[in-house]
Amino acid sequence: MRTLWIMAVLLVGVEGGVIELTKMFVQEMGKNALTSYSLYGCNCGPGGRRKPMDATDSCCHVHKCCYKKLTDCDPIKDRYSYSWVNKAIVCGEDNPCLKEMCECDKAVAIRFRENLDTYDKKKKINLKLFCKKTSEQC
């Protein structure tokens, strides 16, 4: 029961189509987004944009900025479709906002893969108590 509660808390902190984003992470990197990134650094998971701790944390900052541009869909509730073709993510939505949401998630999955060498296990669970507000614009 405790494990289910912990997973529910982690799911709340991940924005976007949770199922889709998690699948993209596994396909791009072989990592689980929920267990590896949902509380990472100062920008991953719940909360506003803060000064990134490293390049991995910066990925979440950019992702939140991408979501901020969405106007006609809700990154928390809405779901989209995509396919995995020749080891590449292909967003396949007729709805322009859902397609853009898919593109945001695709971009962050690729960006995380490109920054795997900056991932610091010590920052995997950060309570964000010492994170500084950022002046970085989206």
Curated annotation (Swiss-Prot):
Pfam families cross-referenced by the UniProt entry: Phospholip_A2_1
GO molecular function: calcium ion binding; calcium-dependent phospholipase A2 activity; phospholipid binding; toxin activity
Cell location: Secreted
InterPro entries named in the record: PLipase_A2 (IPR001211), PLipase_A2_dom (IPR016090), PLipase_A2_dom_sf (IPR036444), PLipase_A2_His_AS (IPR033113)
Gene Ontology biological process: arachidonate secretion; lipid catabolic process; negative regulation of T cell proliferation; phospholipid metabolic process
An annotated GO cellular component: extracellular region
Site (Important residue of the cationic membrane-docking site (MDoS)): K121, K124
Signal peptide boundaries: 1-16
Region annotation (Important for membrane-damaging activities in eukaryotes and bacteria) ranges: 121-133
Annotated site location: Hydrophobic membrane-disruption site (MDiS): L127, F130
Entry-linked SUPFAM superfamilies: Phospholipase A2, PLA2
UniProt main location, coarse: secreted
Site (Cationic membrane-docking site (MDoS)): K128, K133
Function summary: Snake venom phospholipase A2 homolog that lacks catalytic activity. It shows myotoxic and weak anticoagulant activities. A model of myotoxic mechanism has been proposed: an apo Lys49-PLA2 is activated by the entrance of a hydrophobic molecule (e.g. fatty acid) at the hydrophobic channel of the protein leading to a reorientation of a monomer.
Family annotation (PANTHER family): PHOSPHOLIPASE A2 FAMILY MEMBER, PHOSPHOLIPASE A2, MEMBRANE ASSOCIATED
Name of the protein: Basic phospholipase A2 homolog Ts-K49b
